Amino acid sequence: AASDVYKRQAGETAQCAKIFGVDPKVAFLSYSTLGSGKGEDVDKMRNAAAKAKAKYPDLPIEGELQFDAAVSPRVARTKCPGNPVAGHANTFIFPEISAGNIGYKIAQRLGNFEAYGPILLGLNAPINDLSRGCNAAEVYSMAIITAALA
């Protein structure tokens, strides 16, 4: 089931975040925050978050969350007060690859963030990819990241 794939991705992504010195707070992203919306896509992310919480009980995980509730403490106080992940998430599970790709390209181009990846997880060996729009520094950094994952 899709929720099992996302559950596994949460654990692998959190482990990768730890390799880079990030204390992961995982948000399963959606167009809904903790039941504010309805639909199959919401259910998929909510179920995946519940399975991930059960599988990784020591990992801060929440979902489903809208991106603003995941990263903004002010929005989180309104939409899900007292939630330990909401407003502080730093590790994101997107509902599909196209949404993840759009999100990272927006952060890179409008937010002027450095973007690396995609970083492919769950394989027998570290294998990564590069965007055709990357520069030489990003190629170098991906080589370092791939070596760190080996």
Label every PLM stretch briefly.
Residues 1-6:
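Short, small-residue-biased leader/transition segments that mark boundaries at the very start
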Residues 19, 83-84, 99, 104-150:
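Internal helix-turn-beta structural module
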Residues 24-31, 119-123:
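Short acidic (Asp/Glu) and glycine-rich catalytic loops that position anionic groups and cofactors
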Residues 34, 97-100:
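Short glycine-rich anion-binding loops that position phosphate/pyrophosphate groups of nucleotides
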